[in-house]
Amino acid sequence: MSAQRLNAAERDLEKFIKFLVLKSTQVVVQSRLGEKMQTQCNPLAGSDWFNIAVQDHPEVLDETKRALNLKTGESILQRLPLCVEISLKTTEGDQMVLEVWSLDLLQPQNGASPATNDLNPEGQTLKAAHAIYNRMGIMLKSLISLTRTTPAYKLSRRQCPDSYGIFYRIYVDRPQVHTLGEGHKHVKIGQLSTIVGSLVMSVAYRTKLTISPTAAQSESNTIMLKSDHFRPATDANTPGNQQQTQNGTVVAKKLGLGALNPAQGTADRRFIDIEKPLRPGAFTDMGKLKQYTEDDFVLPETPPFEWLLRGRGSVESLNRLDNNSVASVNISNNNNSTQDSKFNQISNLNNNSAGFKSFEKNSENSVSPIKSLLIPASATATYRHHSEPSLQPPPDDDNLLKELHFPFASPTSHVNDLAKFYRECYHAPPLKGLNELQAEISSISSTPPASSGSGGVAACGPTAAATAIATSSADASAMDDLSRQLEQFETSLEDYDKLVSQFGLTGSSSTGSRSSGGLQMSN
Protein backbone atom coordinates (compact mmCIF):
# COMPACT_ATOMS: atom_id res chain seq x y z
CA MET A 1 0.00 0.00 0.00
CA SER A 2 2.82 2.34 0.90
CA ALA A 3 4.61 1.50 -2.35
CA GLN A 4 1.49 2.40 -4.34
CA ARG A 5 1.17 5.68 -2.44
CA LEU A 6 4.84 6.37 -3.09
CA ASN A 7 4.47 5.69 -6.79
CA ALA A 8 1.40 7.98 -6.90
CA ALA A 9 3.38 10.75 -5.18
CA GLU A 10 6.20 10.33 -7.68
CA ARG A 11 3.74 10.55 -10.55
CA ASP A 12 2.30 13.74 -9.07
CA LEU A 13 5.79 15.17 -8.73
CA GLU A 14 6.57 14.29 -12.34
CA LYS A 15 3.37 16.07 -13.36
CA PHE A 16 4.34 19.12 -11.31
CA ILE A 17 7.83 19.13 -12.80
CA LYS A 18 6.42 18.83 -16.33
CA PHE A 19 4.19 21.87 -15.92
CA LEU A 20 6.99 23.74 -14.17
CA VAL A 21 9.14 23.17 -17.25
CA LEU A 22 6.38 24.34 -19.61
CA LYS A 23 5.61 27.45 -17.56
CA SER A 24 9.30 28.30 -17.13
CA THR A 25 9.90 28.35 -20.88
CA GLN A 26 6.80 30.52 -21.33
CA VAL A 27 8.03 33.00 -18.71
CA VAL A 28 11.53 33.27 -20.20
CA VAL A 29 10.43 33.63 -23.82
CA GLN A 30 7.57 36.05 -23.11
CA SER A 31 9.93 38.29 -21.14
CA ARG A 32 11.99 38.79 -24.33
CA LEU A 33 9.11 39.76 -26.61
CA GLY A 34 9.93 43.46 -26.23
CA GLU A 35 6.67 44.48 -24.55
CA LYS A 36 5.41 44.56 -21.00
CA MET A 37 3.19 41.68 -19.95
CA GLN A 38 -0.05 42.57 -18.17
CA THR A 39 -2.20 39.89 -16.57
CA GLN A 40 -5.60 40.40 -15.00
CA CYS A 41 -6.39 39.19 -11.51
CA ASN A 42 -8.32 35.91 -11.66
CA PRO A 43 -10.55 35.28 -8.61
CA LEU A 44 -10.99 31.64 -9.65
CA ALA A 45 -7.35 30.65 -9.54
CA GLY A 46 -8.00 26.94 -9.29
CA SER A 47 -7.29 26.42 -13.00
CA ASP A 48 -3.95 28.30 -12.95
CA TRP A 49 -0.91 26.21 -12.29
CA PHE A 50 1.09 27.31 -9.23
CA ASN A 51 -1.53 30.06 -8.69
CA ILE A 52 0.15 32.22 -11.35
CA ALA A 53 -1.66 33.44 -14.47
CA VAL A 54 0.84 32.67 -17.23
CA GLN A 55 -0.73 32.56 -20.68
CA ASP A 56 0.63 29.82 -22.92
CA HIS A 57 2.03 31.00 -26.24
CA PRO A 58 1.16 28.32 -28.83
CA GLU A 59 4.44 28.55 -30.74
CA VAL A 60 6.55 28.39 -27.59
CA LEU A 61 4.49 25.47 -26.29
CA ASP A 62 5.01 23.53 -29.52
CA GLU A 63 8.74 24.23 -29.51
CA THR A 64 9.03 23.04 -25.90
CA LYS A 65 7.17 19.81 -26.60
CA ARG A 66 9.24 19.24 -29.73
CA ALA A 67 12.44 19.71 -27.72
CA LEU A 68 11.32 17.36 -24.93
CA ASN A 69 10.14 14.77 -27.45
CA LEU A 70 8.33 12.76 -24.80
CA LYS A 71 7.08 9.37 -25.90
CA THR A 72 4.20 7.43 -24.44
CA GLY A 73 5.04 6.25 -20.93
CA GLU A 74 8.37 8.11 -20.86
CA SER A 75 9.17 10.17 -17.76
CA ILE A 76 10.17 13.81 -18.03
CA LEU A 77 12.89 13.20 -15.47
CA GLN A 78 14.92 11.51 -18.19
CA ARG A 79 14.71 14.58 -20.49
CA LEU A 80 16.23 17.07 -18.08
CA PRO A 81 18.14 19.39 -18.13
CA LEU A 82 16.14 21.70 -20.40
CA CYS A 83 17.76 24.94 -21.59
CA VAL A 84 16.37 28.10 -23.16
CA GLU A 85 18.99 30.08 -25.07
CA ILE A 86 18.40 33.79 -25.82
CA SER A 87 20.53 35.28 -28.60
CA LEU A 88 20.83 38.56 -30.49
CA LYS A 89 21.21 38.88 -34.25
CA THR A 90 21.93 42.12 -36.08
CA THR A 91 20.81 43.13 -39.55
CA GLU A 92 24.38 42.59 -40.80
CA GLY A 93 24.20 38.92 -39.81
CA ASP A 94 26.31 39.05 -36.63
CA GLN A 95 24.98 36.83 -33.84
CA MET A 96 25.70 36.79 -30.13
CA VAL A 97 24.34 34.57 -27.37
CA LEU A 98 23.09 36.66 -24.45
CA GLU A 99 21.96 34.17 -21.80
CA VAL A 100 21.11 30.53 -21.14
CA TRP A 101 18.33 29.52 -18.74
CA SER A 102 18.39 25.94 -17.47
CA LEU A 103 16.27 23.64 -15.30
CA ASP A 104 18.14 20.54 -14.12
CA LEU A 105 17.36 17.60 -11.86
CA LEU A 106 20.09 16.23 -9.60
CA GLN A 107 19.53 12.59 -8.70
CA PRO A 108 19.72 11.68 -4.96
CA GLN A 109 22.83 9.89 -3.82
CA ASN A 110 22.73 6.16 -2.90
CA GLY A 111 19.28 5.87 -4.49
CA ALA A 112 17.45 6.63 -1.21
CA SER A 113 14.74 9.23 -0.92
CA PRO A 114 14.50 11.35 2.20
CA ALA A 115 10.87 10.33 2.81
CA THR A 116 11.52 6.60 3.29
CA ASN A 117 13.57 7.09 6.44
CA ASP A 118 10.70 8.56 8.45
CA LEU A 119 8.38 6.60 10.70
CA ASN A 120 5.26 7.50 8.75
CA PRO A 121 6.40 7.61 5.13
CA GLU A 122 2.87 7.89 3.69
CA GLY A 123 2.01 11.06 5.62
CA GLN A 124 5.44 12.58 4.96
CA THR A 125 5.10 11.90 1.25
CA LEU A 126 1.71 13.65 1.02
CA LYS A 127 2.93 16.64 2.98
CA ALA A 128 6.03 16.87 0.82
CA ALA A 129 3.89 16.90 -2.35
CA HIS A 130 1.85 19.93 -1.20
CA ALA A 131 4.95 21.70 0.09
CA ILE A 132 6.79 21.02 -3.15
CA TYR A 133 3.88 22.44 -5.16
CA ASN A 134 3.98 25.68 -3.14
CA ARG A 135 7.76 25.88 -3.39
CA MET A 136 7.51 25.46 -7.15
CA GLY A 137 5.17 28.47 -7.26
CA ILE A 138 7.71 30.53 -5.31
CA MET A 139 10.48 29.40 -7.67
CA LEU A 140 8.40 30.40 -10.70
CA LYS A 141 7.76 33.86 -9.20
CA SER A 142 11.49 34.25 -8.62
CA LEU A 143 12.07 33.37 -12.26
CA ILE A 144 9.58 36.05 -13.38
CA SER A 145 11.41 38.66 -11.30
CA LEU A 146 14.88 37.64 -12.40
CA THR A 147 14.07 37.69 -16.12
CA ARG A 148 13.50 41.47 -15.79
CA THR A 149 16.89 42.15 -14.17
CA THR A 150 19.41 40.72 -16.66
CA PRO A 151 20.95 42.92 -19.42
CA ALA A 152 19.07 41.00 -22.12
CA TYR A 153 15.75 42.45 -20.91
CA LYS A 154 16.77 46.02 -21.81
CA LEU A 155 18.07 44.85 -25.17
CA SER A 156 14.79 43.08 -25.88
CA ARG A 157 12.81 46.25 -25.13
CA ARG A 158 14.93 48.21 -27.64
CA GLN A 159 14.88 45.69 -30.48
CA CYS A 160 13.63 46.79 -33.89
CA PRO A 161 13.84 45.33 -37.41
CA ASP A 162 16.30 48.03 -38.51
CA SER A 163 18.98 47.28 -35.92
CA TYR A 164 18.74 43.85 -34.30
CA GLY A 165 16.34 41.14 -33.18
CA ILE A 166 16.09 38.74 -30.23
CA PHE A 167 15.90 34.99 -30.89
CA TYR A 168 15.32 32.00 -28.64
CA ARG A 169 16.27 28.35 -28.86
CA ILE A 170 15.07 25.48 -26.69
CA TYR A 171 17.17 22.34 -26.42
CA VAL A 172 17.71 19.40 -24.08
CA ASP A 173 21.37 19.28 -23.13
CA ARG A 174 23.89 20.73 -20.73
CA PRO A 175 24.03 24.55 -20.82
CA GLN A 176 26.46 25.73 -23.49
CA VAL A 177 28.04 28.50 -21.44
CA HIS A 178 31.15 28.69 -23.64
CA THR A 179 29.15 30.77 -26.15
CA LEU A 180 28.72 33.56 -23.56
CA GLY A 181 32.31 34.72 -23.85
CA GLU A 182 34.73 35.61 -21.11
CA GLY A 183 33.57 36.98 -17.79
CA HIS A 184 30.02 35.62 -17.93
CA LYS A 185 28.11 35.26 -14.68
CA HIS A 186 26.17 32.32 -13.30
CA VAL A 187 23.24 32.84 -10.91
CA LYS A 188 21.26 30.12 -9.16
CA ILE A 189 17.60 31.09 -9.03
CA GLY A 190 16.47 28.35 -6.67
CA GLN A 191 16.91 24.76 -5.56
CA LEU A 192 14.13 22.44 -4.47
CA SER A 193 14.72 19.02 -2.87
CA THR A 194 12.15 16.37 -3.71
CA ILE A 195 11.83 12.63 -3.34
CA VAL A 196 13.00 12.17 -6.93
CA GLY A 197 15.96 14.54 -6.71
CA SER A 198 16.86 18.21 -6.40
CA LEU A 199 15.45 20.68 -8.92
CA VAL A 200 17.98 23.41 -9.74
CA MET A 201 16.98 26.49 -11.75
CA SER A 202 19.83 28.77 -12.85
CA VAL A 203 20.86 31.29 -15.49
CA ALA A 204 24.19 32.16 -17.09
CA TYR A 205 24.35 35.51 -18.87
CA ARG A 206 26.91 37.52 -20.81
CA THR A 207 28.59 40.57 -19.30
CA LYS A 208 30.59 41.77 -22.32
CA LEU A 209 28.08 42.86 -24.96
CA THR A 210 30.66 43.56 -27.69
CA ILE A 211 30.13 41.57 -30.86
CA SER A 212 33.34 39.93 -32.09
CA PRO A 213 33.07 37.64 -35.15
CA THR A 214 36.03 35.50 -34.04
CA ALA A 215 34.74 34.83 -30.52
CA ALA A 216 32.79 31.70 -31.41
CA GLN A 217 35.55 30.06 -33.49
CA SER A 218 37.29 27.04 -32.07
CA GLU A 219 40.96 27.12 -31.19
CA SER A 220 41.82 24.36 -33.65
CA ASN A 221 40.50 26.33 -36.62
CA THR A 222 43.61 28.01 -38.00
CA ILE A 223 42.56 28.26 -41.66
CA MET A 224 42.35 31.80 -43.03
CA LEU A 225 39.11 32.31 -44.95
CA LYS A 226 37.54 35.19 -46.78
CA SER A 227 34.90 37.27 -45.07
CA ASP A 228 32.22 36.17 -47.56
CA HIS A 229 33.26 32.50 -47.68
CA PHE A 230 30.30 31.16 -45.72
CA ARG A 231 26.94 31.85 -47.31
CA PRO A 232 23.70 31.82 -45.27
CA ALA A 233 22.13 28.41 -45.73
CA THR A 234 18.45 28.21 -46.68
CA ASP A 235 18.14 24.46 -47.02
CA ALA A 236 17.17 22.43 -43.97
CA ASN A 237 19.50 19.60 -45.08
CA THR A 238 22.66 21.70 -44.77
CA PRO A 239 25.27 20.58 -42.21
CA GLY A 240 24.65 23.64 -40.05
CA ASN A 241 20.95 22.91 -39.68
CA GLN A 242 21.57 19.20 -39.17
CA GLN A 243 23.91 20.02 -36.31
CA GLN A 244 21.27 22.23 -34.72
CA THR A 245 18.54 19.61 -34.96
CA GLN A 246 20.61 16.90 -33.25
CA ASN A 247 19.86 15.87 -29.65
CA GLY A 248 16.36 17.32 -29.77
CA THR A 249 17.41 20.89 -30.49
CA VAL A 250 15.55 23.23 -32.79
CA VAL A 251 16.48 26.22 -34.90
CA ALA A 252 16.36 29.62 -33.18
CA LYS A 253 13.05 31.45 -33.57
CA LYS A 254 12.50 35.17 -33.96
CA LEU A 255 11.05 37.12 -31.04
CA GLY A 256 9.41 40.54 -31.04
CA LEU A 257 6.14 42.17 -31.98
CA GLY A 258 6.25 40.81 -35.54
CA ALA A 259 8.34 37.98 -36.92
CA LEU A 260 10.37 38.71 -39.98
CA ASN A 261 10.23 36.82 -43.22
CA PRO A 262 12.44 33.70 -42.90
CA ALA A 263 13.98 34.40 -46.29
CA GLN A 264 14.86 37.95 -45.31
CA GLY A 265 17.81 37.11 -43.12
CA THR A 266 19.11 34.35 -45.38
CA ALA A 267 18.98 36.21 -48.68
CA ASP A 268 22.30 36.80 -50.39
CA ARG A 269 23.57 40.33 -50.32
CA ARG A 270 23.87 42.14 -53.60
CA PHE A 271 27.23 43.66 -54.40
CA ILE A 272 27.77 46.41 -56.99
CA ASP A 273 30.84 46.11 -59.18
CA ILE A 274 32.09 49.62 -59.91
CA GLU A 275 34.47 48.51 -62.65
CA LYS A 276 31.73 46.71 -64.57
CA PRO A 277 30.46 48.91 -67.44
CA LEU A 278 26.85 49.97 -67.33
CA ARG A 279 24.53 48.39 -69.85
CA PRO A 280 22.17 50.61 -71.84
CA GLY A 281 18.46 50.39 -71.22
CA ALA A 282 15.82 49.01 -73.50
CA PHE A 283 14.93 50.87 -76.72
CA THR A 284 18.10 52.96 -76.51
CA ASP A 285 19.67 54.35 -79.68
CA MET A 286 23.24 53.14 -79.50
CA GLY A 287 24.37 55.75 -82.03
CA LYS A 288 23.47 58.62 -79.72
CA LEU A 289 25.31 57.26 -76.71
CA LYS A 290 28.53 59.08 -75.90
CA GLN A 291 31.59 56.91 -75.59
CA TYR A 292 33.61 58.14 -72.64
CA THR A 293 37.38 57.91 -72.67
CA GLU A 294 40.08 58.56 -70.10
CA ASP A 295 40.40 62.17 -71.25
CA ASP A 296 36.86 62.88 -70.10
CA PHE A 297 37.78 62.07 -66.51
CA VAL A 298 40.85 64.33 -66.35
CA LEU A 299 40.18 67.46 -64.33
CA PRO A 300 41.17 70.77 -65.98
CA GLU A 301 44.01 72.81 -64.53
CA THR A 302 41.92 75.98 -64.34
CA PRO A 303 39.77 76.30 -61.24
CA PRO A 304 36.02 75.81 -61.66
CA PHE A 305 33.68 78.80 -62.02
CA GLU A 306 36.55 80.98 -63.25
CA TRP A 307 34.16 82.83 -65.52
CA LEU A 308 32.47 84.28 -62.42
CA LEU A 309 35.64 86.10 -61.42
CA ARG A 310 36.22 89.64 -62.70
CA GLY A 311 39.21 90.05 -65.00
CA ARG A 312 42.13 92.31 -64.14
CA GLY A 313 41.78 94.27 -67.41
CA SER A 314 38.48 95.81 -66.35
CA VAL A 315 39.95 97.18 -63.12
CA GLU A 316 43.04 98.58 -64.87
CA SER A 317 40.95 100.28 -67.56
CA LEU A 318 38.71 101.72 -64.89
CA ASN A 319 41.70 103.10 -63.00
CA ARG A 320 43.13 104.68 -66.15
CA LEU A 321 39.73 106.18 -66.98
CA ASP A 322 39.39 107.54 -63.47
CA ASN A 323 42.87 109.10 -63.48
CA ASN A 324 42.31 110.73 -66.88
CA SER A 325 38.99 112.21 -65.82
CA VAL A 326 40.46 113.64 -62.62
CA ALA A 327 43.41 115.15 -64.50
CA SER A 328 41.15 116.76 -67.12
CA VAL A 329 38.95 118.24 -64.41
CA ASN A 330 41.95 119.70 -62.61
CA ILE A 331 43.25 121.33 -65.84
CA SER A 332 39.85 122.79 -66.64
CA ASN A 333 39.55 124.17 -63.12
CA ASN A 334 42.93 125.88 -63.37
CA ASN A 335 42.18 127.45 -66.77
CA ASN A 336 38.61 128.52 -66.04
CA SER A 337 38.76 129.59 -62.42
CA THR A 338 36.56 132.65 -63.06
CA GLN A 339 33.62 130.73 -64.55
CA ASP A 340 30.35 130.25 -62.79
CA SER A 341 30.15 127.38 -60.25
CA LYS A 342 26.95 126.06 -61.78
CA PHE A 343 28.63 125.55 -65.15
CA ASN A 344 31.48 123.65 -63.45
CA GLN A 345 29.05 121.31 -61.71
CA ILE A 346 27.22 120.53 -64.96
CA SER A 347 30.49 119.82 -66.80
CA ASN A 348 31.69 117.54 -63.99
CA LEU A 349 28.44 115.61 -64.06
CA ASN A 350 28.72 115.17 -67.84
CA ASN A 351 32.29 113.92 -67.50
CA ASN A 352 31.27 111.36 -64.87
CA SER A 353 28.33 110.08 -66.89
CA ALA A 354 30.49 109.82 -70.02
CA GLY A 355 33.15 107.90 -68.11
CA PHE A 356 30.59 105.46 -66.70
CA LYS A 357 29.06 104.88 -70.17
CA SER A 358 32.46 104.17 -71.67
CA PHE A 359 33.18 101.66 -68.92
CA GLU A 360 29.88 99.92 -69.56
CA LYS A 361 30.81 99.62 -73.25
CA ASN A 362 34.10 98.01 -72.30
CA SER A 363 32.38 95.50 -70.03
CA GLU A 364 29.79 94.29 -72.56
CA ASN A 365 31.49 90.90 -72.81
CA SER A 366 30.48 90.01 -69.25
CA VAL A 367 28.67 86.69 -68.90
CA SER A 368 26.28 87.78 -66.18
CA PRO A 369 23.02 89.31 -67.54
CA ILE A 370 23.06 91.93 -64.75
CA LYS A 371 26.05 94.21 -65.07
CA SER A 372 28.06 94.86 -61.96
CA LEU A 373 27.71 98.31 -60.46
CA LEU A 374 31.16 99.94 -60.67
CA ILE A 375 31.31 103.50 -59.35
CA PRO A 376 34.58 105.42 -59.89
CA ALA A 377 35.65 108.42 -57.89
CA SER A 378 33.64 111.42 -59.08
CA ALA A 379 35.29 114.62 -60.21
CA THR A 380 32.85 116.61 -58.11
CA ALA A 381 34.29 115.11 -54.97
CA THR A 382 37.76 116.13 -56.14
CA TYR A 383 36.47 119.63 -56.87
CA ARG A 384 35.04 119.92 -53.34
CA HIS A 385 38.28 118.75 -51.80
CA HIS A 386 40.26 121.35 -53.80
CA SER A 387 37.81 124.11 -52.86
CA GLU A 388 38.11 123.24 -49.15
CA PRO A 389 41.82 122.91 -48.35
CA SER A 390 41.12 122.82 -44.61
CA LEU A 391 39.52 119.34 -44.83
CA GLN A 392 41.72 116.26 -45.10
CA PRO A 393 40.93 114.16 -48.20
CA PRO A 394 39.92 110.53 -47.62
CA PRO A 395 42.41 107.75 -48.33
CA ASP A 396 42.92 106.57 -51.89
CA ASP A 397 41.38 103.09 -51.41
CA ASP A 398 41.93 102.11 -55.06
CA ASN A 399 40.70 105.47 -56.33
CA LEU A 400 37.48 105.13 -54.36
CA LEU A 401 36.42 102.15 -56.48
CA LYS A 402 33.21 100.76 -55.09
CA GLU A 403 31.82 97.59 -56.55
CA LEU A 404 28.53 95.76 -56.20
CA HIS A 405 27.86 92.42 -57.93
CA PHE A 406 24.49 90.83 -58.56
CA PRO A 407 25.46 87.47 -60.10
CA PHE A 408 22.14 85.70 -59.48
CA ALA A 409 19.72 88.53 -60.27
CA SER A 410 17.32 88.36 -63.21
CA PRO A 411 17.06 91.16 -65.83
CA THR A 412 13.64 92.18 -64.47
CA SER A 413 14.78 92.35 -60.86
CA HIS A 414 14.33 95.47 -58.75
CA VAL A 415 18.04 95.48 -58.05
CA ASN A 416 18.52 97.39 -61.33
CA ASP A 417 16.46 100.27 -59.99
CA LEU A 418 18.42 100.18 -56.76
CA ALA A 419 21.70 100.35 -58.69
CA LYS A 420 20.40 103.23 -60.80
CA PHE A 421 19.30 105.15 -57.70
CA TYR A 422 22.61 104.54 -55.96
CA ARG A 423 24.52 105.65 -59.05
CA GLU A 424 22.54 108.91 -59.37
CA CYS A 425 22.91 109.66 -55.68
CA TYR A 426 26.64 109.06 -55.83
CA HIS A 427 27.14 111.34 -58.87
CA ALA A 428 24.79 114.11 -57.66
CA PRO A 429 26.47 117.55 -57.72
CA PRO A 430 27.30 119.01 -54.31
CA LEU A 431 25.26 121.92 -52.98
CA LYS A 432 26.88 125.14 -51.91
CA GLY A 433 26.54 125.90 -48.28
CA LEU A 434 25.77 129.23 -46.66
CA ASN A 435 29.38 129.64 -45.60
CA GLU A 436 30.62 129.52 -49.20
CA LEU A 437 27.98 132.02 -50.38
CA GLN A 438 28.76 134.43 -47.54
CA ALA A 439 32.49 134.14 -48.28
CA GLU A 440 31.96 135.10 -51.93
CA ILE A 441 29.69 138.04 -51.02
CA SER A 442 32.14 139.34 -48.44
CA SER A 443 35.06 139.05 -50.88
CA ILE A 444 33.16 141.05 -53.50
CA SER A 445 31.96 143.73 -51.05
CA SER A 446 35.42 144.21 -49.54
CA THR A 447 36.87 145.40 -52.88
CA PRO A 448 37.47 149.26 -52.53
CA PRO A 449 35.91 151.49 -55.27
CA ALA A 450 38.11 153.75 -57.46
CA SER A 451 38.27 157.47 -56.31
CA SER A 452 39.52 160.73 -57.92
CA GLY A 453 42.36 162.67 -56.32
CA SER A 454 41.12 166.25 -56.89
CA GLY A 455 37.96 166.93 -54.96
CA GLY A 456 37.63 163.89 -52.85
CA VAL A 457 34.32 163.07 -54.54
CA ALA A 458 33.78 159.50 -55.72
CA ALA A 459 34.10 159.04 -59.43
CA CYS A 460 30.95 157.94 -61.18
CA GLY A 461 32.64 156.46 -64.24
CA PRO A 462 31.51 153.44 -66.17
CA THR A 463 33.91 151.09 -64.31
CA ALA A 464 32.46 151.84 -60.90
CA ALA A 465 28.93 151.55 -62.18
CA ALA A 466 29.65 148.19 -63.80
CA THR A 467 31.24 146.90 -60.61
CA ALA A 468 28.28 147.96 -58.52
CA ILE A 469 25.82 146.41 -60.95
CA ALA A 470 27.78 143.14 -61.03
CA THR A 471 27.94 143.04 -57.24
CA SER A 472 24.24 143.65 -56.82
CA SER A 473 23.33 141.14 -59.53
CA ALA A 474 25.58 138.49 -57.99
CA ASP A 475 24.04 139.04 -54.56
CA ALA A 476 20.54 138.95 -55.99
CA SER A 477 21.18 135.79 -58.04
CA ALA A 478 22.78 134.01 -55.08
CA MET A 479 19.89 134.86 -52.79
CA ASP A 480 17.36 133.95 -55.49
CA ASP A 481 19.02 130.57 -55.98
CA LEU A 482 19.07 129.91 -52.25
CA SER A 483 15.44 130.94 -51.78
CA ARG A 484 14.39 128.87 -54.79
CA GLN A 485 16.13 125.79 -53.42
CA LEU A 486 14.55 126.26 -50.00
CA GLU A 487 11.11 126.59 -51.59
CA GLN A 488 11.63 123.45 -53.60
CA PHE A 489 12.72 121.53 -50.50
CA GLU A 490 9.72 122.76 -48.53
CA THR A 491 7.26 121.87 -51.30
CA SER A 492 8.84 118.41 -51.69
CA LEU A 493 8.94 117.72 -47.94
CA GLU A 494 6.23 115.07 -48.14
CA ASP A 495 8.05 113.30 -50.95
CA TYR A 496 11.23 113.13 -48.90
CA ASP A 497 9.30 111.76 -45.90
CA LYS A 498 7.72 109.10 -48.09
CA LEU A 499 11.13 108.29 -49.51
CA VAL A 500 12.64 107.76 -46.07
CA SER A 501 9.70 105.62 -44.91
CA GLN A 502 9.80 103.46 -48.05
CA PHE A 503 13.52 102.91 -47.65
CA GLY A 504 12.91 101.71 -44.13
CA LEU A 505 10.10 99.31 -45.12
CA THR A 506 10.29 98.03 -48.70
CA GLY A 507 12.78 100.01 -50.77
CA SER A 508 10.76 99.75 -54.01
CA SER A 509 11.94 100.89 -57.43
CA SER A 510 9.47 103.82 -57.56
CA THR A 511 11.17 105.28 -54.50
CA GLY A 512 14.48 105.47 -56.33
CA SER A 513 13.04 107.28 -59.34
CA ARG A 514 11.18 109.83 -57.20
CA SER A 515 14.19 110.48 -54.98
CA SER A 516 16.49 110.93 -57.95
CA GLY A 517 14.03 113.44 -59.43
CA GLY A 518 14.08 115.37 -56.17
CA LEU A 519 17.87 115.49 -56.22
CA GLN A 520 17.91 116.72 -59.82
CA MET A 521 15.53 119.53 -58.92
CA SER A 522 18.13 120.90 -56.53
CA ASN A 523 20.39 121.85 -59.40
Curated annotation (Swiss-Prot):
The modification Phosphothreonine is found at residue 238. InterPro entries: ATG13, Atg13_N, HORMA_dom_sf. Interacts with Atg1. One of its GO terms (biological process) is macroautophagy. It comes from the Eukaryota. Autophagy factor required for autophagosome formation. Target of the TOR kinase signaling pathway that regulates autophagy through the control of the phosphorylation status of Atg13 and Atg1. The Atg1-Atg13 complex functions at multiple levels to mediate and adjust nutrient-dependent autophagic signaling. Involved in the autophagic degradation of dBruce which controls DNA fragmentation in nurse cells. It is found in: Cytoplasm, Cytosol; Preautophagosomal structure. GO terms for cellular component: Atg1/ULK1 kinase complex; autophagosome; cytosol; phagophore assembly site. Phosphorylated in a nutrient-, TOR- and Atg1 kinase-dependent manner. Keywords: Autophagy, Cytoplasm, Phosphoprotein. It comes from Drosophila melanogaster (Fruit fly). GO terms for molecular function: protein kinase regulator activity. The lineage of its organism: Eukaryota, Metazoa, Ecdysozoa, Arthropoda, Hexapoda. Disruption phenotype: Results in late stage egg chambers that contain persisting nurse cell nuclei without fragmented DNA and attenuation of caspase-3 cleavage. Belongs to the ATG13 family. Metazoan subfamily. This is Autophagy-related protein 13 homolog. Its main location: cytoplasm. The modification Phosphoserine is found at residues 227, 314, 317. Residues 504-523 are annotated as: Disordered.
